[in-house]
Amino acid sequence: MANYFNTLNLRQQLAQLGKCRFMGRDEFADGASYLQGKKVVIVGCGAQGLNQGLNMRDSGLDISYALRKEAIAEKRASWRKATENGFKVGTYEELIPQADLVVNLTPDKQHSDVVRSVQPLMKDGAALGYSHGFNIVEVGEQIRKDITVVMVAPKCPGTEVREEYKRGFGVPTLIAVHPENDPKGEGMAIAKAWAAATGGHRAGVLESSFVAEVKSDLMGEQTILCGMLQAGSLLCFDKLVAEGTDPAYAEKLIQFGWENITEALKQGGITLMMDRLSNPAKLRAYALSEQLKEIMAPLFQKHMDDIISGEFSSGMMADWANDDKKLLTWREETGKTAFETAPQFEGKIGEQEYFDKGVLMIAMVKAGVELAFETMVDSGIIEESAYYESLHELPLIANTIARKRLYEMNVVISDTAEYGNYLFSYACVPLLKPFMAELQPGDLGSAIPEGAVDNAQLRDVNDAIRSHAIEQVGKKLRGYMTDMKRIAVAG
């Protein structure tokens, strides 16, 4: 099969990369009604599969789970999760033929096998749903022309999808209809109903395309969301220990530092994160971030180029065919790093201490977020999509590191994200070592002393931070989410 994106001409590629529209709340006035009374069969009961299914059932939809015969016979985790939550479970042959909508929520590497198994069983005119478009865009899966193909992609891990729904809200979501598979023109109605059933319409929905979702998602997870956090963790830990910091303290400062720093990012963007620093520290963090952007820009651009061309996907799929040899080797090597094996620190680190002693980490976050955003936008991806795939998801990934270091992050994210993370971090760590050798006292592990600052310089730095395009679009999108949350709570 041919990579779908590469079969398009340049005009079509640019049109699909640039498809992005923030949908009004009034467009979801009918909620999930378009799917009520219809049979929705979910294939896969992992984090997204289970939690989307729970939300959809609570929204009044008929949900069941189709699993492989072996998974049912051996009572595997997917079978246990579905049955323990009271769902009907059956084999593909038992459930797929009656389904009006089949939702494929298995891991990327299983998509081709799953689609080839379920497609012959699907009734004429049924719909096939995805929450990530890799199989369609990168693999180039060919779907029967009578089948409608849609996507609903929550911009959060599955557990968060459920928790926000239970709070009466939802998570920001991208929806799309595959232009090659919308025979009855009902794709958007199906996608909107599915998104509403998960609660996504309460947090904001972007009408996107399979292409824009895949290319931006891959770029975000490889660079700022996972790769930068992994490279930054390893580099910062080694630097602290080399300069005499207790390994246990160094580990805690980094493990929980990302989460504390990005919580400010979540609430008020890069502006608020930088405002948590003293004026001298802010000026230093800004200078460091500008140096980092200059050093890392070619690496970010290479990742984007390889994603656009399909080079990344072909390399990863070759590793799938080789029993994940590269992925498993990189995973094992990461587990043996000094950061992952360091002892735990039993003392307390105050919230402000993470900022005061983590100026370099803040600079890394700022540089990584801005570079990922800028590189995506330069490649034709609309700013709203680039924001969701860079700044918005970063606090969620940082939270996984706070739980069980890099191990937890790499367990929670998809194998696709993990593979891309290793590609980036293995290139980024040696790239930044000369930069790390030139750091000054106060950049990491100790606070920068208070002192006089140049007012004009501080003014210019503040203006540069606040006027960046990601701050402008971020303020708008965070405002939508806040407004919608108030409406949801009031309702």
From Swiss-Prot:
Belongs to the ketol-acid reductoisomerase family. Its cofactor is Mg(2+). It holds the Pfam family KARI_N. GO terms for molecular function: ketol-acid reductoisomerase activity; magnesium ion binding. This is Ketol-acid reductoisomerase (NADP(+)). The lineage of its organism: Bacteria, Pseudomonadati, Pseudomonadota, Gammaproteobacteria, Enterobacterales. Pathway: Amino-acid biosynthesis; L-isoleucine biosynthesis; L-isoleucine from 2-oxobutanoate: step 2/4; Amino-acid biosynthesis; L-valine biosynthesis; L-valine from pyruvate: step 2/4. Mg(2+) 2 binds at residues 217, 389, 393. Involved in the biosynthesis of branched-chain amino acids (BCAA). Catalyzes an alkyl-migration followed by a ketol-acid reduction of (S)-2-acetolactate (S2AL) to yield (R)-2,3-dihydroxy-isovalerate. In the isomerase reaction, S2AL is rearranged via a Mg-dependent methyl migration to produce 3-hydroxy-3-methyl-2-ketobutyrate (HMKB). In the reductase reaction, this 2-ketoacid undergoes a metal-dependent reduction by NADPH to yield (R)-2,3-dihydroxy-isovalerate. Keywords: Amino-acid biosynthesis, Branched-chain amino acid biosynthesis, Magnesium, Metal-binding, NADP, Oxidoreductase, Repeat. Substrate binds at residue 414. It catalyses: (2R)-2,3-dihydroxy-3-methylbutanoate + NADP(+) = (2S)-2-acetolactate + NADPH + H(+); (2R,3R)-2,3-dihydroxy-3-methylpentanoate + NADP(+) = (S)-2-ethyl-2-hydroxy-3-oxobutanoate + NADPH + H(+). Its EC number is 1.1.1.86. Signal peptide: none annotated. InterPro entries: 6-PGluconate_DH-like_C_sf, 6PGD_dom2, KARI, KARI_C, KARI_N, NAD(P)-bd_dom_sf. One of its GO terms (cellular component) is cytosol. NADP(+) binds at residues 45-48, 68, 76, 78, 108-110, 158. Residues 209-344, 345-484 form the KARI C-terminal knotted domain. The active site is at 132. The keyword Nucleotide-binding does not apply. Binds 2 magnesium ions per subunit. It is an enzyme of class 1 (oxidoreductase). One of its GO terms (biological process) is L-valine biosynthetic process. It comes from Salmonella dublin (strain CT_02021853). Mg(2+) 1 binds at residues 217, 221. Residues 15-208 form the KARI N-terminal Rossmann domain.
